[in-house]
């Protein structure tokens, strides 16, 4: 008995494989007779669906398909499916409000990306607007109205970006929080600087005008002059030279000591102004 069951199962699998091969053969055979561009596009979409279904059948566990629902290849009547129904799996996630209501909820894990929306003005914290869609009927929510296209050009810049979850925005959020804290600290301090004393603005002006190196040299020179003014003034010492020996004068005591004959002729002046002959 078990042998008969195994043979029946193998025969059933072979029959299903033959049906799939026949379906694929019919689909490819019909593609030869097509001529218009609309039919070619429709056939390309059907071939893509067939390849996706075949890949899902051969894989052990398909994460895209619902559990327990077997996938079947399209039959010979699949060529008569209209183009709008054949391309239903490839509907973009970002739809206008009229079409977003007709589409069912998206599976969990689908990412929404607004990279193609170049007209929107976004802040520094959310440049890409990538978020994971939530499950439910409100998963495919339409885009918010663009204020920069309808209103004045500067109206959209003041809008705060919507909080979107995602690991790719953590760095941007940290940078935005740090810049916000820095702005709050600057706002709490009294504004003692004017617009001309702002170092960032002055640096930008110097870079644009090309006078950055000149300004740096001028500041270094002025700082050197300030340091020289703060130092005490000291007389400059001349160059060192050998001492010059001058001949001693005859009236000096050194000359008297050096010349014993002149010591008798030397006269000393006392405090009273009386000249006393030297001994």
From Swiss-Prot:
GO terms for molecular function: molecular function inhibitor activity. It is found in: Cytoplasm. Residues 1-24, 56-76, 136-200, 228-279 are annotated as: Disordered. Keywords: Cytoplasm, Phosphoprotein, Proto-oncogene, Wnt signaling pathway. Signal peptide: none annotated. GO terms for biological process: canonical Wnt signaling pathway; positive regulation of canonical Wnt signaling pathway; regulation of protein export from nucleus. Residues 7-24 have a biased composition (Acidic residues). InterPro entries: GSK3-bd. It holds the Pfam family GSK-3_bind. GO terms for cellular component: cytoplasm; cytosol; intracellular membrane-bounded organelle; nucleus. Coiled coil: none annotated. The keyword Oxidoreductase does not apply. The modification Phosphoserine is found at residues 88, 249, 252. Its main location: cytoplasm. It comes from the Eukaryota. Phosphorylated. Belongs to the GSK-3-binding protein family. Binds DVL1. Binds GSK-3 and prevent GSK-3-dependent phosphorylation. This is Proto-oncogene FRAT1.
């Amino acid at each position: 008995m078990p042998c008969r069951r195994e043979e029946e199962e193998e025969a059933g699998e072979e029959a299903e494989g033959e049906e799939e091969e026949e379906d694929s053969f019919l689909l490819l055979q019909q593609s030869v007779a097509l001529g218009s561009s609309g039919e070619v596009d429709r056939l390309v979409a059907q071939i893509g669906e067939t390849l996706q279904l075949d890949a899902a059948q051969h894989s052990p566990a398909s994460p895209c398909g619902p559990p327990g629902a077997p996938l079947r290849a399209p039959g010979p009547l699949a060529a008569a499916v209209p183009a709008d129904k054949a391309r239903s799996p490839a509907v973009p996630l970002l739809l206008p409000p009229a079409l977003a209501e007709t589409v069912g909820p998206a599976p969990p894990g689908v990412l929404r990306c607004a990279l193609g929306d170049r007209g929107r003005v976004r802040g520094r914290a959310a440049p890409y607007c990538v978020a994971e869609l939530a499950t439910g009927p409100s998963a495919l929510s339409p885009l918010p109205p663009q204020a920069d296209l309808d209103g004045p050009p500067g109206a959209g810049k003041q809008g705060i970006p919507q909080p979107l979850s995602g690991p790719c925005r953590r760095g941007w959020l940290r940078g935005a929080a740090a810049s916000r804290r820095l702005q709050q600290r600057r706002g709490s301090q009294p504004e003692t600087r004017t617009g001309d004393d702002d170092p960032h603005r002055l640096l930008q002006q110097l870079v644009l005008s090309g006078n950055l190196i000149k300004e740096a040299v001028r500041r270094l020179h002025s700082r050197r002059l300030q340091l020289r003014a703060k130092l005490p003034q000291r007389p400059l010492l001349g160059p060192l030279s050998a001492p010059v020996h001058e001949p001693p004068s005859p009236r000096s005591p050194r000359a008297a000591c050096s010349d014993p004959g002149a010591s008798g002729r030397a006269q000393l002046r006392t405090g009273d102004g009386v000249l006393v002959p030297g001994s």
